[in-house]
């Protein structure tokens, strides 16, 4: 009787330790987020050690629920850009179409160049949209194919400071490609593609 009792006590102690270890063990080395759309989910790994300010700001928006019922609203394809411009391919999203008043109140994120971060605009890179350096906030884009023009020192901006890359799609690139092929009017998705939410994993 006592033998069974001690065996059971030891078993439950082991299970408790296992559960505690599982809870304390991080699932990922870097934070991951899931972009939820009707076309499927896009999993993105973020790089806080390389682009700490960009990642911190983006995660603060994710945690606050800012991206709930937002959208992908802009698309660049080779065929929808003027023949005189450099060609790039991407999808851009955020709250600009769904809550532009809120977007205008958000503080700018200090610009982290790809020269500083070491990140490049390759297929699946997520990066902050901006006008002038330090003006980026809630809006972001995902590269479809390699886009070196968006890196530091290249031609996407007159200031040649590039855009602030801060993560990469690690699962669901087929969803990005599917969204990229949806109908557009000029550079605008028609209709916009709903982002149901962006959540931490």
Describe the predicted segments one by one.
Residues 1-29:
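Bacterial Sec-dependent N-terminal signal peptides
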